[in-house]
Amino acid sequence: MDATARQRIVAAGIITKAAETLQIANMRLANHEYLVVSAELMDTARSLKTVARQLRELHDLTE
């Protein structure tokens, strides 16, 4: 497996985890667990920024 394929797999994993975190956050908001949700959303945002950076790098490599 080449580096590009590995980066895509890692990016897909992070995006999947982010989606799961957002679903959990939605449930916690319904239970008024605002501080927990805030921390989880900050972690999710960092993960998504990492994915965005990796995808930009991947795009640059494939051009």
Language-model features and meaning:
Residues M1-H32, R56-D60:
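N-terminal acidic leader/helix
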Residues M1-A3, Q23, L41-T44, V51:
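Coiled-coil-like amphipathic alpha-helices with heptad-repeat character
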Residues R46-E63:
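Amphipathic alpha-helical coiled-coil segments
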Residues I9, T16, L35-R46:
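Short, charged, amphipathic alpha-helical segments
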